[in-house]
């Protein structure tokens, strides 16, 4: 348990409309279903509410924004400070306007692909197979099937730690492979994407292909977090992991997927420490076998058990 911060924040922010909770479990909000609590969990009502909250939040309080937790390990000791979770009700918009698709940061990537398809706009089909939200896609330049967020983004809207709103163009996002160089303290709230007119049949065929690939090649019905490690230049992470003999490797309740060995899975009773230790063991074995050091793609946040409180 962390010291109670939520009560003090509520008292200092009488006009807050969103939901503010103290020592709130985060495990149910992640795909791995592991991890400790947030000292404060804030779900803003909308962008104005988020700006109000940040404008009054003491500068020394750490802040982290999460989406649906599909690419996240929350450590067992939880997270000190404030965790902000953007909910679909205030940030889940997905609509088309001509050749532009507007999406809130809490909109599922899959929904954005479907919105584009309904408007007969191609180019965003790759989002159909990414199990996250647009906020996460902006932060990590999410991509699949040879396409990335930087290929379709027009601009993004974000709120800074002072509660001020910014519009960031494509160049300002400073995208690279699975990364953005934009200020890490910014919280993305929405984005605009450019589609290309295409036939409905062609769009649907690409989306079906994406889904079929996921069904056949990825453990999508397990408690997992998606691709664990980035592909090193010129290599596939899963091939390096397989060559190092890590397919099926298990530590505690965590296991390297037999189906796709760049996926770690919670086989029922894993702790965050089990999953992270397994990942580090994989990295060590790959380095020893190939000389290549894998880099985590999954974000690991929080403190280890026993540190909090």
From Swiss-Prot:
UniProt pathway annotation: Cell wall biogenesis; peptidoglycan biosynthesis
One GO molecular-function entry: UDP-N-acetylmuramate dehydrogenase activity
PROSITE patterns noted in UniProt: FAD_PCMH
Pfam families named in the record: FAD_binding_4 (PF01565), MurB_C (PF02873)
Keywords, in A-Z order: Cell cycle, Cell division, Cell shape, Cell wall biogenesis/degradation, Cytoplasm, FAD, Flavoprotein, NADP, Oxidoreductase, Peptidoglycan synthesis
Chief site of localization: cytoplasm
EC number: 1.3.1.98
Active site: 178, 227 (proton donor), 297
Listed Gene3D superfamilies: 3.30.465.10, UDP-N-acetylenolpyruvoylglucosamine reductase, C-terminal domain, Uridine Diphospho-n-acetylenolpyruvylglucosamine Reductase, domain 2
Kinase is among the record's keywords: no
HAMAP family according to UniProt: MurB (MF_00037)
Xref: NCBIfam families: murB, PRK13905.1
Family indicated by similarity: Belongs to the MurB family.
Protein name as catalogued: UDP-N-acetylenolpyruvoylglucosamine reductase
Organism in which the protein naturally occurs: Rhodopseudomonas palustris (strain HaA2)
């Amino acid at each position: 348990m962390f010291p109670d911060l939520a009560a003090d924040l509520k008292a200092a922010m009488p006009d807050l409309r969103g939901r503010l909770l103290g020592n709130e479990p985060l495990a149910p909000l992640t795909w791995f279903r592991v991890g400790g609590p947030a000292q404060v969990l804030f779900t803003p009502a909308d962008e104005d509410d988020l700006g109000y909250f940040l404008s009054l939040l003491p500068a020394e309080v750490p802040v982290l924004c999460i989406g649906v937790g599909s690419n996240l390990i929350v450590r067992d000791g939880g997270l000190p400070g404030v965790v902000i979770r953007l909910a679909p009700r205030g940030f889940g918009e997905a609509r088309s306007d001509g050749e532009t698709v507007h999406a809130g940061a809490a909109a599922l990537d899959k929904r954005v692909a479907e919105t584009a398809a309904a408007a007969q706009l191609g180019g965003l089909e790759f989002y159909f197979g990414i199990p996250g939200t647009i906020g996460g896609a902006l932060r990590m330049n999410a991509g699949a099937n040879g396409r990335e967020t930087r290929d379709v983004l027009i601009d993004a809207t974000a709120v800074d730690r002072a509660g001020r709103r910014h519009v960031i163009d494509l160049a300002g996002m400073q995208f690279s492979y699975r990364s953005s160089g934009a200020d890490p303290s910014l919280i993305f709230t929405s984005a605009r994407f450019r589609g290309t007119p295409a036939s409905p049949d062609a769009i649907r065929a690409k989306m079906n292909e994406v889904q079929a690939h996921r069904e056949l090649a990825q453990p999508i019905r397990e408690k997992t977090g998606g691709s664990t490690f980035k592909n090193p230049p010129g290599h596939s992470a899963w091939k390096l992991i397989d060559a190092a003999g890590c397919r099926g490797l298990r530590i505690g309740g965590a296991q390297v997927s037999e189906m796709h060995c760049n996926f770690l899975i919670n086989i029922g009773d894993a702790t965050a420490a089990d999953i992270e230790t397994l990942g580090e063991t994989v990295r060590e074995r790959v380095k020893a076998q190939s000389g290549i050091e894998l880099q985590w793609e999954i974000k690991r946040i929080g403190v280890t058990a026993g540190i909090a409180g």
